Structures are given as structure tokens and as C-alpha cells.
Amino acid sequence: MTLFNLTDLASTLPRNARLIGLDPGSKIIGIALSDVGRRLATPYGAMKRGKLAEAAATILDIARKEGAAALIIGLPLSMDGSIGPAAQAARDWAHAIARETGLPVAMMDERLSSAAVNRALIEADVTRAKRAGRVDAAAASYMLQGALDLLNEPRPEE
């Protein structure tokens, strides 16, 4: 299955279908979920990054349980916007997840999402131990919210 750009993905979605945001790290995958109006992202949880088939099964279970119709996967572009090794690995994983789950997938720039989330948690005086368990899902939520904001921007009339 091919990857969609965000706008094309939105035009294929059924009404009131949620989106799942995934922030794939080297060890943990952060998970976030949109509301049915696709306006608000919330942290959902995290899972260990293991075998592809297991990750795909977990993602499909969440999609069925929560009424999600597509995935938005974080793309860790380099600071200059280029595709480095981490972004290429995320793209390869996104293609594999799309193929395994059969769900449509779009990718979203996630530069500095973990840093922004860490900074917010530090400002909220969350201890380092508690931050460790929350950053992945919060980073997925931060990235998904960025995608939702783009999808909800008014478009100029053609």
C-alpha cells in the first residue's frame, strides 16, 4: 500500500472516523488518537517496538476498538528538512505497517516533538521517572495534533 499525502488521505476517510498517530522510536512506539471530529489529539499509550506483525496486530486492534480509519506516522526529518537515516527508517516502517494493516497511512513531520513534550512536562514539574513513561504517547499526540491542525486549516477557494 502506498503512503498518502495528508490532504489526499483526508479526502478518502469516512465521516466520524478517528485517526491514530504513531511516533515510532527505536524501542517504543507512542500512540495517540483523534476525536471523531478530527480536531483534538490525545495520548493513547505506548507499545514496545518488536516484530512488525505484532505491532500491526496491536494497531489494528486499536483501530477496530476506537473506530479509526487511518494512521498518521511521525517522520523525523533532519533539521534542514532533508530525509536522513532516521526518516528513511520511519518511511520504510510506515510502508510495512500500511501493507500489514491495510490501513491508509500518511506521514507528518515530527521534528522536535519529543523535545517540546519533554520541555512541557518539565515545566509542569513532572518527575523524570514519570516523564519517561509519558513522553512517547505525548509526542505522538503532539505530532497528530499538528496533522489535525493542518487538516482543519481553511483552504483558499480555487
Swiss-Prot record:
Species of the source:
Acidiphilium cryptum (strain JF-5)
What is any one of the record's Gene Ontology cellular component terms?
cytosol
Alphabetized Gene3D superfamilies for the sequence: YqgF/RNase H-like domain
Annotated CDD domains: YqgF (cd16964)
Cellular compartment(s): Cytoplasm
Q: Which NCBIfam families match?
A: RNAse_H_YqgF
Q: Name one Pfam family in it.
A: RuvX
The molecular function GO annotations come to: nuclease activity
Q: Give the family this protein belongs to, as stated in its UniProt record.
A: Belongs to the YqgF nuclease family.
Major site of localization recorded for this protein: cytoplasm
Q: What does this protein do?
A: Could be a nuclease involved in processing of the 5'-end of pre-16S rRNA.
A GO biological process of this protein is:
rRNA 5'-end processing
Report keywords, A-Z.
Answer: Cytoplasm, Hydrolase, Nuclease, Ribosome biogenesis
The protein's name: Putative pre-16S rRNA nuclease
Stated EC number for the protein is 3.1.-.-
Q: Carries keyword Protein biosynthesis?
A: no
